[in-house]
């Protein structure tokens, strides 16, 4: 039996080697104290952001992370199917299957999805950034965005390796087709540009069609204008 793994994991592991243990799950998560007529109540920062319909993707993407993101998306749709959901992305990418699970859920639920790159959206992170609702995909000015082809490795019998190679090629075609759909680029250009790591600034990502806007400063509330 072949020992097979493929996806965007290689890039994520390369960037985060020695640092994954310091991911968001193992850090001290800040608490927010909220005061109401019933007294004080403490929330972890991510639960508090979720109340504002904000999801933070700040780690490599694996099945566990995907499960959490998918659950939050479905919950927020059940709370209000008409209000936008905001996903802030700072991720080096990760598993294709896990990322596609998030992608399919983003397309499936009713609310518009606003995606924002804060820091880096690479590999599957860039794919999810581009997959937000058209007109509602953004980046902060000094973020970096990177696209590339899926990588994979297999060992075992020759027939198993050939089967896996064909599967990787199918996945590559699928991702190229979807990225072309969301960016407006030709599939042939997506294939050429993703042959190797293609890094972009926020301005370049906007020109490419990965995002629609560059946020430099949050607008003041209307009452302050």
UniProtKB/Swiss-Prot annotation:
Give the record's GO biological process terms: protein quality control for misfolded or incompletely synthesized proteins
Localization recorded for this chain is: Cytoplasm
Instruction: Specify whether Protease is a keyword of the entry.
Output: yes
Q: Which reaction does it catalyse?
A: Hydrolysis of proteins to small peptides in the presence of ATP and magnesium. alpha-casein is the usual test substrate. In the absence of ATP, only oligopeptides shorter than five residues are hydrolyzed (such as succinyl-Leu-Tyr-|-NHMec, and Leu-Tyr-Leu-|-Tyr-Trp, in which cleavage of the -Tyr-|-Leu- and -Tyr-|-Trp bonds also occurs)
Q: Which PANTHER family match?
A: ATP-DEPENDENT CLP PROTEASE PROTEOLYTIC SUBUNIT
Q: How does the record describe its quaternary structure?
A: Fourteen ClpP subunits assemble into 2 heptameric rings which stack back to back to give a disk-like structure with a central cavity, resembling the structure of eukaryotic proteasomes.
Family per record: Belongs to the peptidase S14 family.
Q: Per its record, how is this protein called by name?
A: ATP-dependent Clp protease proteolytic subunit
This protein's species is Chlorobaculum tepidum (strain ATCC 49652 / DSM 12025 / NBRC 103806 / TLS)
The upper taxonomy is: Bacteria, Pseudomonadati, Chlorobiota, Chlorobiia, Chlorobiales
Q: Which gene encodes it?
A: clpP
